[in-house]
Swiss-Prot record:
PROSITE patterns: DUSP (PS51283), USP_1 (PS00972), USP_3 (PS50235). Keywords: Cell membrane, Membrane. GO terms for molecular function: cysteine-type deubiquitinase activity. The gene is UBP5. Pfam families: DUSP, Ubiquitin_UBP8, UCH. It comes from Oryza sativa subsp. japonica. This is Inactive ubiquitin-specific protease 5. Residues 323-382 form the USP domain. The keyword Acyltransferase does not apply.
Amino acid sequence: MEMEMEMVVAVPSPEVPAEEERALIRDITVAAEAHAKEGDTFFLITHRWWQSWIDYVIQDLANSTNNGSHHHEHGSNVLRRPGAIDNTDLIDDTASEVSNMEIELHDTLVEGRDYILLPQQVWEKLHGWYGGGPTLPRKAINTGLSQTDLAIEVYPLRLQLLLAPKGEQAVIRISKKDTVGELHKKACEVFDLIPDEVCIWDYYGRTRHSLMDNLEKTLDDANIQMDQDILVEVTTDANGSLDGGCIGSIQENEYLERESTSLIADASKSGLSNENFASNNYTSRSYSSSLTQSQYLRSSNGDLDNMHGTSAMITRGSPLGLTGLLNLGNTCFMNSAIQCLVHTPEFARYFREDYHREINWQNPLGMVVSTLSTSMALKPYV
């Protein structure tokens, strides 16, 4: 699942009235979310620019409440149309230098604070109106048994390839829904190797766990983690003849273990293991933003799929099941309040019935106070 990034700076089209922009984006968003499916492309846009656009297109609603009419009393209160889209604050130029991705995102981005996810049709409309860039596409992937269990893979797997016995290294990005065969192909392309002479190992924690020989299995099913190592083994000797292949390496691997030790030393000398990888508190950074129709271009907080950067949280290979939460702080009080509310019969009954009829959709104060409220104002409640 290749993900291409484009440093496209489009020329903006003639201006469209703010009210028309708001209506078009609302309608396009509702239609796009209703038909979202696996493989659809979504685009990141910086929250800073998005908020300026929101303020611009809803100012007529806000002013109609503040002034009692749609006319502004003071021309200085009129918000100007935003300039070109500028996503550069999302880009990590340093990380891009060592990855196969043309553009790398900062590791610590948070949806709703740093960026917003837009359906392709919405991005294309805004990009056509305002121009700018760079373009940051991401794919919707399936995360469950149902076809509707979709997520946006904002951060594809970042893997470090270690070539044995030469000791070369490379950093790549690949979707966790790609197959082992696709990883094998990409590794051969990176190191310019002959596929029939190469096998790859799950090298999590600098330990050879298993030979990755099931080419149809997805990396997710193979339990491959964010920022882990993949050992790429060339199965020919110095004379170019086969040395017994991967099966032989499993039985007689002393030479490979010595080479692996040297690879560890080489990696520690390079910047790959420390500076260019999120190796402190963010070692496992596999965000998947949940896509639901009950929210406007928002997803739940990206989950840290694998926090093996924290010694107490090594869960690789653990069976699925119930889990606890760590370091919740004061959120326990919020949880207690929610539990009380949802178990109050009158309160619960109210939200099971058609409470939508009591919502005043025309009240701009209630609908545009916060970022979430302004976003919700652009579409009917689903």
